[in-house]
């Protein structure tokens, strides 16, 4: 039976974007089969909710966003979409509340002056979006290489790792016989310590795992999100625009406020 690419539940959206880094051992509990099976069935379960609660980086953001929206469910679709892709709800969240959240959560990892500067930067206000976690060094909570978390190392190495870790968007050019998609996307690049989106280029994205896909039916011209090289979901034009908007916002902020060494 084909796997539906339509996501109607926040837990499924979160699972789709969490699956591959969890499979690679970078974040979350050892419940990868629960994530995969839930994505394939497109159904929420108590086992899935419990697995997602084990993501020490993502889940607190989801809970914070949901609480800010007045939602009792931390995996409310609006909260999951806000964090993983971006939507208008992010701009309704109190900057003061988010500042308090980051200060309390990361006080042992960064000096409070750094977090304060994020909110004082004359660029964009920080949003609880996945790209903020990637570009502003909060990924020290994961198990990615030290050069990524600290921002140290050659530009191409750090930029390449950030490119894999952020949620990318790509327009499908073709599909091959091995279950891969060739998409055109804007890669993250770093030059002299500054991040930017590079010239659109084709890249291969894995679209199947064990013969099944989260983006079943994706065709030429469709847009898909992908994370650590794996296709997560088919995007609407509005979602593409939001994902790009909040990615650029967080990238600009990262360039304006250097990570403390």
Placement of each model-derived feature along the sequence:
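N-terminal intrinsically disordered, low-complexity, charge/repeat-rich segments that act as generic
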Residues: 1-156
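Structural detector for short beta-strands of small beta-barrel domains
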Residues: 160-178, 183
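Beta-strand/loop nucleic-acid-binding surfaces
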Residues: 192-215
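Short, well-ordered loop/turn sites that connect or cap secondary structure elements
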Residues: 217-219
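Short, Lys/Arg- and Gly-enriched loop/turn segments at beta-strand edges
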Residues: 229-242
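Short peripheral tails and domain-boundary helices/loops at the edges of structured domains
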Residues: 239-261
